[in-house]
């Protein structure tokens, strides 16, 4: 399989990458950023299992903020590249 990728833009730890065979570019996330997100979600699950709703909520909020920052970076880079999003924002 010969797939070609093109780096369209980079913002912080995230990059917008287009590759052959895909209609829309994807978001490349650094491995450490992805690992931190997974660890935060695992912490939320652990706190829920312990019955500590406040700590679980805090961890979920942190993970949601991280995911939102990824989505916002993706949307800005898509806009900067003059590309439509693959989903509706309404």
Which residues fall in each region the model found?
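Short N-terminal "domain-start" leader segments
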Residues: 1-9
């Amino acid at each position: 399989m010969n797939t070609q990728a093109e780096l369209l833009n980079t913002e912080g730890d995230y990059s917008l990458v287009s590759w052959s065979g895909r209609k829309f570019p994807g978001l490349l996330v650094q491995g450490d950023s992805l690992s931190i997100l997974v660890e935060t979600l695992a912490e939320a699950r652990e706190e829920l299992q312990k019955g500590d709703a406040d700590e679980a909520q805090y961890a979920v909020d942190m993970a949601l903020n991280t995911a939102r920052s990824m989505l916002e970076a993706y949307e800005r880079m898509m806009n900067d590249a003059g590309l439509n999003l693959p989903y509706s924002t309404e």
